[in-house]
């Protein structure tokens, strides 16, 4: 194992000198044993001349001094994989952070891997039920597909991801991997305790590199989580779920690292390699003939601007998008999904069937008509509308409220029991509202209920 010496430390960037001809390869992991015995991992990023490499640290560089000895491992960062990581919480380099002793994983995978070969990819399209009405009806997720949850600050991305983990892990009993990338540590802590209580933890591996970590860890932790998921797909031939919260922080960390390495910034100050980095990550999240990785990624939208380069680059890779809207959150409708802005590639009668497709289209039409009429209502009031339009508005408002739903993970906030709504129940409910079967019920009956039967029961109490 070749040894080098630290020559310079600038925040999370560390320069290391090696003897001539012994430079580590790009992306190789280097390790430093600190004076207190703890291990710090660096990742090689640049070669500066014949004898020096520039590296990025995966943890805080506090307490490092020039001249400390650095060992070259000769390979990229290795993540522990397999059944041993289920029920455990790891950091970016695969060390446990849950205080429950060492991880007993026999195999490791490099966090930098090539995407599956073109001929190994699977192309079949099938829907994947989440139990959330607005998603299953209007932007169905595909098994083995990639879904993005877009939203500004505080509109409910993390709550929606936690609900999806809860529903899918309970209903489908598959393995899940959760990568927490640059988000709040408190939310990770909540997720951990909730999973412990619900018993879902035994089928889930959690990997965290949160807001307080240096950019190196935040830029790599998504890859660690992905490697764990790839093992289950490729070696155990399973269908795995990969949750990433938040993919924007992956880009943000990449931008910090890029600036620290002295690269010229590109549009809006992002790194010039933005599209490449995103592509390398997203291309590995895919389904092969062996198994599938279905991913749900929360994507923070800076200043609610969907044209910002970070969310715009992520858009290109996704099969379905769920856009969370502040206007809908302000109406008190949760999940605050914008039914007209969200899309899905499999919203196609050949995949989901005519009944589902026609219902989804009629819901979108009635909501779009209501949106068009809102300007007239704001200026002239409801009385100026034709009888036909008044009926459209009344039904659209019921549809809008029926798109809300009480969540299991939000029971503490809403005081209502969570609901898992089967797809056929969703379709039936929306068809009946649009057909006018429930024109006699008040709007409030449709707010925060599961099935249409619950709305009818609720109407009796109003």
Curated annotation (Swiss-Prot):
InterPro entries: AAA+_ATPase, ATP-synt_VA_C, ATP_synth_F1_bsu, ATPase_a/bsu_AS, ATPase_alpha/beta_chains, ATPase_F1/V1/A1_a/bsu_N, ATPase_F1/V1/A1_a/bsu_N_sf, ATPase_F1/V1/A1_a/bsu_nucl-bd. It catalyses: ATP + H2O + 4 H(+)(in) = ADP + phosphate + 5 H(+)(out). Pfam families: ATP-synt_ab, ATP-synt_ab_N, ATP-synt_VA_C. It is found in: Cell inner membrane. GO terms for cellular component: plasma membrane; proton-transporting ATP synthase complex. It comes from the Bacteria. Coiled coil: none annotated. PROSITE patterns: ATPASE_ALPHA_BETA. Its main location: membrane. GO terms for molecular function: ATP binding; ATP hydrolysis activity; proton-transporting ATP synthase activity, rotational mechanism. Its EC number is 7.1.2.2. Gene3D superfamilies: 2.40.10.170, Bovine Mitochondrial F1-atpase, Atp Synthase Beta Chain, Chain D, domain 3, P-loop containing nucleotide triphosphate hydrolases. SUPFAM superfamilies: C-terminal domain of alpha and beta subunits of F1 ATP synthase, N-terminal domain of alpha and beta subunits of F1 ATP synthase, P-loop containing nucleoside triphosphate hydrolases. Keywords: ATP synthesis, ATP-binding, Cell inner membrane, Cell membrane, CF(1), Hydrogen ion transport, Ion transport, Membrane, Nucleotide-binding, Translocase, Transport. It is a peripheral membrane protein. ATP binds at residues 151-158. Belongs to the ATPase alpha/beta chains family. NCBIfam families: atpD (TIGR01039). F-type ATPases have 2 components, CF(1) - the catalytic core - and CF(0) - the membrane proton channel. CF(1) has five subunits: alpha(3), beta(3), gamma(1), delta(1), epsilon(1). CF(0) has four main subunits: a(1), b(1), b'(1) and c(9-12). This is ATP synthase subunit beta 1. It comes from Chlorobium luteolum (strain DSM 273 / BCRC 81028 / 2530). The gene is atpD1.
């Amino acid at each position: 194992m070749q040894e080098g010496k630290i020559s310079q430390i600038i925040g999370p960037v560390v320069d290391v000198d090696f003897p001539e001809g012994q430079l580590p390869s790009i992306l190789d992991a280097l390790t430093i044993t600190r004076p207190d015995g703890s291990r710090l991992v660096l990742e090689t990023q640049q070669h500066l001349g014949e004898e020096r490499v520039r590296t990025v640290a995966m943890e805080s560089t506090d307490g490092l001094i020039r001249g400390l000895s650095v060992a070259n491992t000769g390979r990229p960062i290795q993540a522990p994989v397999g059944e041993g990581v289920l029920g455990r919480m790891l950091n970016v380099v695969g060390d446990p952070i849950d205080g429950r002793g060492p991880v007993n994983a026999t195999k490791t995978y490099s966090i930098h891997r090539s995407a599956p070969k073109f001929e190994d990819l699977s192309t079949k399209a099938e829907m994947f039920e989440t139990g959330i009405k607005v998603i299953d009806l209007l932007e169905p997720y595909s098994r083995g597909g990639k879904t993005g949850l877009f939203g500004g600050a505080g509109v409910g991305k993390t709550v929606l991801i936690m609900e999806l983990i809860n529903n899918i892990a309970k209903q489908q009993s598959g393995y899940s991997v959760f990568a927490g990338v640059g988000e709040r540590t408190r939310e990770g802590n909540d997720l951990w305790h909730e999973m412990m209580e619900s018993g879902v933890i035994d089928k889930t591996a959690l990997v965290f590199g949160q807001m307080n970590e240096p950019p190196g860890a935040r830029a790599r932790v998504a890859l660690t989580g992905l490697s764990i998921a790839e093992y289950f797909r490729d070696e155990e031939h399973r269908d795995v779920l990969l949750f990433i919260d938040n993919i924007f922080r992956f880009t943000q960390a990449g931008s910090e690292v890029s600036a620290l390495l002295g690269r010229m910034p590109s549009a809006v100050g992002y790194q010039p390699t933005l599209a490449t980095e995103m592509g390398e990550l997203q291309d590995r999240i895919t389904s092969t003939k062996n198994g599938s990785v279905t991913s749900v990624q929360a994507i923070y939208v800076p200043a609610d601007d969907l044209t910002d380069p970070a969310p715009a680059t992520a858009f290109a890779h996704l099969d379905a998008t769920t856009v969370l809207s502040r206007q809908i959150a302000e109406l008190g409708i949760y999940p605050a999904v914008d039914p007209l802005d969200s899309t899905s590639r499999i919203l196609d009668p050949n995949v989901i069937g005519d009944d589902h497709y026609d219902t989804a289209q009629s819901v979108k039409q009635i909501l779009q008509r209501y949106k068009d009429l809102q300007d007239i209502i704001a200026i002239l009031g409801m009385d100026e509308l034709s009888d036909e339009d008044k009926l459209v508005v009344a039904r659209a408002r019921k549809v809008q409220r029926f798109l809300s739903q009480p969540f299991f993970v939000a029971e503490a906030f809403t005081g209502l029991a969570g609901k898992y709504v089967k797809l056929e129940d969703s379709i039936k409910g929306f068809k009946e509202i649009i057909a006018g079967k429930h024109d006699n019920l008040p709007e409030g009956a449709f707010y925060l209920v599961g099935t249409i039967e619950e709305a009818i029961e609720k109407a009796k109490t109003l």
